[in-house]
């Protein structure tokens, strides 16, 4: 008994000591998290020009920037060295010039800052400056991520309060002057009140009561208006119940009663359509005083005709329609939106709201990017780890319960870094989409961008091995444990980013996932007809053209210097892949991703799925469309035009692929709206894509865009027709989510510019020239009717400003209101806006706002604050100023 008492006393004493230790460590974490004020100041984006050894540090393209990271301790003194700050940096940190601290990269964008032996503590009120050298440049505020946190052994990690905010401007300074330039030769026009005013000067308010978005193929305007104050009598039997409900939902938004008085006749008569009108989605419609008559090629055409009725309605005064007749058909069969819910999750409600708007503007393909390195977002029955582990990001260094934090998500799961669609959620999305004539295309990205899957299946492997179930543990394992390949992916992950394409277990995994997803589609009554393989960026960036070997005899100044002998191609050190190379199944390691795509296409075809889709670089080593087992093989083409895309897109079409134009420099909606550091987004392909630029994109004549736009540095480029090829299959607008951390940010980035993508996908404009081999375009070619382009955009912009933005607001969409242009001349304020019809306001003190009228320009002095305001007055743009 005495022995037991002594043991018990010893245990209690030990536990008390542990509790005391844990408490002191937690106190340090809490103190630093609550009291450290962290600020970033950009010092230069031209490191090499400022004497920094970018090349010797191994910076890609020998390009680096310098930033001061300043830490101010606003709390009590901290003497402990046993702590670390984890912070997110999309740029690799190459050097920290402070002997008291060291920085290491954990994985992806997650970096670790910790004290060295020379650390002498944080005194109360002390300011510590850490000069950081990072790769490339940092030109926009959203290059800097929130979500830094403090950790210590035996303590719960805690978010640093000063970086627990979406107000990035509160901790970033220095983005001005030359620091706005990517290089000293950057010729972009930076957005300010005056430059916006000059850009908008060719726009004018005009009557657009008979103008419809997207523009129909043929419109004949009548005289007068048709009274619909008492609603329209839409025949309910023309649609199934779910589609009629979808139509009713849109009718409520625009303020039209579909069970009213004005007769509407709808018939589906495909035999009556010939030539360019004989295709799915086509319709003819007549709107007259005695009723509306619709004749459709198919059910999709009937649905779109009704959407055209709603499109002509002014939701702020929904009592009339213009008399007119329409003959209409879509330009492309594929009119898509891609939404990345993997990097950061977006809610089911946000997806449903997107489907509503897609239907209203006649878009018909929702491509869901469901998986990536940073997250797996779809429940798969039988593989619970995919969502238990792969759908969550938190601070677990072993990644047994979650993925490590990325992209500003911090140490906890209570944000959009975590989340997934349950099976029921996904089935609901499918049903909702089907009712709106939209096909949902699921993308499970592989073999690259697959870290969430790989880590999840390793967690599954470990669980089952602990249970003694070795065969079951290996059933769906995705990495070769003997693979020692040293690789760095585009977003700075190691070999865990890749599904090993040489293992039978990988093929079983793909088969399992496709089967489960197909079953969900079947349950929803929307059979799976297209499987998106992903396939992009299966490479080691260190073997790219931006690096040279440390021992190279003829080094160039514009490449980073590294030891290339330590770098591998993906899978090069995998014994299982080496076997495939040795036995001649695959010619070399570079061909493995395309080989894997071909193998997956066989699984897809065996399951009766007719269409196989991928990002084009994933298929680059395949021998054309005939190498795939499915009826159709489609590629999202995403080469940048000024890097050769004006020509290479036609190569893919010539190989027999159905090309879906998806160019990042024109239809990526994660790029900033303006060349302004306040705007959100990545900008590797273009410094900005606003609604006007997207509207002016010529998707079938790629060289033409060289005359109407510039490269990412604001310089001209050339494009020449070189290859004869079949017509393209479609157009897709993409929203990648690295910088998009919540639904509000998501809708801001997508709307309203996605309406310009809808316009280009449905309608070919007169100013779009035919593609011709031998014709070259540039800033000086003068082959494009730019007057016609500008007039066309003016109409489009007026429809947005006068009608469509109000509909977005009534739909609850957090769209972006344009920042006004303004100038002061002779003491008078002049203002304009990208979408005529949007209300403008100004203020002399930043608090009291007055409505601007161009016919009564006000006299002003000093700094004048400006903004635009929505139709309800409840939503305002970003506020800027002019002097």
UniProtKB/Swiss-Prot annotation:
SUPFAM superfamilies, A to Z: (Trans)glycosidases, beta-N-acetylhexosaminidase-like domain, Carbohydrate-binding domain, E set domains
Localisation per UniProt entry: Cell outer membrane
PROSITE patterns: PROKAR_LIPOPROTEIN
Gene Ontology CC terms, in alphabetical order: cell outer membrane
Signal peptide: 1-17
Main function: Hydrolysis of terminal, non-reducing N-acetyl-beta-D-glucosamine residues in chitobiose and higher analogs, and in glycoproteins.
Protein name per Swiss-Prot or TrEMBL: N,N'-diacetylchitobiase
Native organism: Vibrio harveyi (Beneckea harveyi)
């Amino acid at each position: 008994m005495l022995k037991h008492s002594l043991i018990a006393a010893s245990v209690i004493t030990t536990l008390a000591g542990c509790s005391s230790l844990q408490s002191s460590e937690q106190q340090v974490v809490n103190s630093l998290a609550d009291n450290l004020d962290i600020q970033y100041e950009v010092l230069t984006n031209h490191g090499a020009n400022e004497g920094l050894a970018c090349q010797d540090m191994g910076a890609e393209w020998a390009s680096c920037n310098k930033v001061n990271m300043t830490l101010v301790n606003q709390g009590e003194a901290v003497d402990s060295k046993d702590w670390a700050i984890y912070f997110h940096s999309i740029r690799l940190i190459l050097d920290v010039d402070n002997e008291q601290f060291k920085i290491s990269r954990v994985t992806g964008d997650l970096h670790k800052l910790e004290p060295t032996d020379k650390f002498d503590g944080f005194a109360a009120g002390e300011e510590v400056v850490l000069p950081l050298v990072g790769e490339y440049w940092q030109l926009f505020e959203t290059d800097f991520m929130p979500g830094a946190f403090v950790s210590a052994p035996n303590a719960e990690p805690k978010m640093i309060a000063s970086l627990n905010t979406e107000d990035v401007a509160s901790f970033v300074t220095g983005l001005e002057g030359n620091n706005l330039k990517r290089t000293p030769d950057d010729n972009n026009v930076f957005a300010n009140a005056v430059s916006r005013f000059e850009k908008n000067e060719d726009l004018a308010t005009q009557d657009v009561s008979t103008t419809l978005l997207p523009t129909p193929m043929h419109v004949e305007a009548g005289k007068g208006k048709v009274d619909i104050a008492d609603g329209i009598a839409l025949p309910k039997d023309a649609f199934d119940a779910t589609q009629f409900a979808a139509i009713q939902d849109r009718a409520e938004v625009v303020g039209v009663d579909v069970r009213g008085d004005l007769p509407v006749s709808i018939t589906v008569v495909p035999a009556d359509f010939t030539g360019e009108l004989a295709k799915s989605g086509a319709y003819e419609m007549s709107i007259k005083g005695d009723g509306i008559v619709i004749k459709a090629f198919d059910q999709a055409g009937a649905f779109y005709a009704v959407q055209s009725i709603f499109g002509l309605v002014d939701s702020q005064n929904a009592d009339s329609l213009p008399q007119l007749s329409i003959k209409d058909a879509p330009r492309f069969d594929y009119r898509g939106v891609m939404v990345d819910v993997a990097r950061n999750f977006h809610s089911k409600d946000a997806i449903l709201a997107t489907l509503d708007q897609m239907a209203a503007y006649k878009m018909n393909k929702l491509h869901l990017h469901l998986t990536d390195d940073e997250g797996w977002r779809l429940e798969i029955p039988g593989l619970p780890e995919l969502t238990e582990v792969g759908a969550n990001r938190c601070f677990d260094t072993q990644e047994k319960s979650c993925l490590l934090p990325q992209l500003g998500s911090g140490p906890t799961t209570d944000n959009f870094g975590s989340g997934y669609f349950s099976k029921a959620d996904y089935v609901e999305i499918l049903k909702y989409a089907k009712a709106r004539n939209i096909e949902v295309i699921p993308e499970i990205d592989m073999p690259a961008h697959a870290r969430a899957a790989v880590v999840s299946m390793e967690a599954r492997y470990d669980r089952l091995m602990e249970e003694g179930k070795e065969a079951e543990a290996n059933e769906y394992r995705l990495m070769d444990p003997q693979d020692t390949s040293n690789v760095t992916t585009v977003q700075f992950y190691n070999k865990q980013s890749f599904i090993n394409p040489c293992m039978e277990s990988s093929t079983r995994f793909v088969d399992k996932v496709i089967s489960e997803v197909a079953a969900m589609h079947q349950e929803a009554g929307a059979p799976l007809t297209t499987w998106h393989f992903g396939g992009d960026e299966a490479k080691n960036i260190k073997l790219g053209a931006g690096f040279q070997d440390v021992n190279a005899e003829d080094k160039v100044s514009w490449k980073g210097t590294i030891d290339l002998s330590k770098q591998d191609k993906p899978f090069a050190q995998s014994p299982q892949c080496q076997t495939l190379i040795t036995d001649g199944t695959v010619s070399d390691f570079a061909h493995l991703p395309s080989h894997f795509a071909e193998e997956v296409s066989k699984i897809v075809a065996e399951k009766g799925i007719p269409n196989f889709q991928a990002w084009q670089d994933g298929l680059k080593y395949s021998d054309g469309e005939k190498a795939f087992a499915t009826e159709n093989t489609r590629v999202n083409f995403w080469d940048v035009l000024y890097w050769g895309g004006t020509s290479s897109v036609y190569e893919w079409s010539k190989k027999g692929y159905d090309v879906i134009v998806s160019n990042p420099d024109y239809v990526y909606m994660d790029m900033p709206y303006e060349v302004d550091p306040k705007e959100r987004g990545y900008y590797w392909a273009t410094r900005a894509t606003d609604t006007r630029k997207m509207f002016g994109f010529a998707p079938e004549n790629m060289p033409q865009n060289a005359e109407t736009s510039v490269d990412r540095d604001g310089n001209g480029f050339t494009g020449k027709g070189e290859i004869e090829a079949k017509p393209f299959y479609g157009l897709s607008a993409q929203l990648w989510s690295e910088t998009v951390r919540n639904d509000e940010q998501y809708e801001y980035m997508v709307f309203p510019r996605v309406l310009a993508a809808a316009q280009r996908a449905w309608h070919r404009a007169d100013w779009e020239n035919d593609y011709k081999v031998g014709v070259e375009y540039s800033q000086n070619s003068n082959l494009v009717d730019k007057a016609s382009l500008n007039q066309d955009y003016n109409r489009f912009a007026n429809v947005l400003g006068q009608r469509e933005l109000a509909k977005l607001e009534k739909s609850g969409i957090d769209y972006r209101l344009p920042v006004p242009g303004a100038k002061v001349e002779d003491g008078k304020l002049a203002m304009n806006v990208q979408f005529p019809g949007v209300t403008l306001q100004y203020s002399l003190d930043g608090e009291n706002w007055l409505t601007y009228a161009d016919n009564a320009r006000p006299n002003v002095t000093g700094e004048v604050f400006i903004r635009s305001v929505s139709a309800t007055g409840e939503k305002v743009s970003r506020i800027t100023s002019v002097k």
